[in-house]
């Protein structure tokens, strides 16, 4: 079978990605089948996503989609305060404010992220 991943291995910095065994109705693992857990990992800022996180989310969903042993994806977050509060306002204020061409590029990434989650 052909490998359809864009990269071989990736060391995620902004998110956590785990493959967890699929469980049968008795609670035991189903051999060779997994759920992919993709978790935002910025609890101190209520899991707001940075540009780097957006790129990692796209890649993680793409990798899960290409993995023939993954049967479901769980999109979650670290911490108990918020799943996600949206884009990182600190990054917006420092980099994207007053820089419309760069913000346009960011919005392209954002739209790609939404598409990767929905597909």
Report residues per predicted region.
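A short acidic, glycine-rich active-site loop
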Residues: 94-108
């Amino acid at each position: 079978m052909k490998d359809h991943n864009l990269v071989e291995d990736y060391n995620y910095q902004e998110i956590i990605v785990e493959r967890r065994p699929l469980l049968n109705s008795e609670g035991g693992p189903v051999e060779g089948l997994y759920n992919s857990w993709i978790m935002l990992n910025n609890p101190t800022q209520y899991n707001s996503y940075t540009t780097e996180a957006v790129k990692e989310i796209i890649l993680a969903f793409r990798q899960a989609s290409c993995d023939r042993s993954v049967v479901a994806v769980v999109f979650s977050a670290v911490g108990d305060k918020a799943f996600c509060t949206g884009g990182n306002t600190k990054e917006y204020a420092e980099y994207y404010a007053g820089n419309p061409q760069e913000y346009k590029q960011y919005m392209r990434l954002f739209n790609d992220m939404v598409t990767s989650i929905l597909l």
